[in-house]
Amino acid sequence: MYKKILVPTDGSEFAKKAQKHALFLANISGAEIIAVSVTENNFVNGLPLDDEIYQLNQILNERSEENLKEFDKLNESDVKITHVIREGSPAKVILEVANEENIDLIVMGSSGKSGFDRFIMGSVADKVVNSAKCAVLVVH
């Protein structure tokens, strides 16, 4: 049924729950997992690239790598997991990777945003659900 499952991860508890669901589904379907971690860098766009900005980007990329390694630790079977780290808007990157990789299912955690931020920006999960060309499972 599923051949490729995309699992965005940001290290949140909702993302970890989604990872467990994705691993279960991949295990029973024989699917491979593409795990994506997005470094959101819109706050530095347009700023001159000095040492502090460079260091901040390095820290964010290291966190992305750590999140993906934590996901690997949950994999108790032989599910193939491929890591992807990208910079940009999370929803946009998730949708791009889904299209590039011909993803059958996206399994993601519900957004951790609340209040005014969510009202203004909407959640990543909302944007993905409304724009994805494949099935999306949102885990809360």
Residue ranges and their predicted role:
Residues 73-106:
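Structural beta-alpha unit
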Residues 53-66:
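A short acidic, glycine-rich active-site loop
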Residues 96-140:
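Gly/Ser-rich helix-loop-strand patches that form or flank binding pockets
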Residues 63, 85-89, 111:
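Short beta->alpha linker loops
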Residues 1, 29-32, 79-80, 102:
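Short loop/turn motifs at secondary-structure junctions
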Residues 18, 64-67, 124:
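Hydrophobic alpha-helical membrane-association signature
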Residues 1-17, 77, 82, 131-140:
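Intrinsically disordered or low-complexity boundary/linker segments at protein termini
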Residues 3-52:
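Small/aliphatic-rich secondary-structure junction motif
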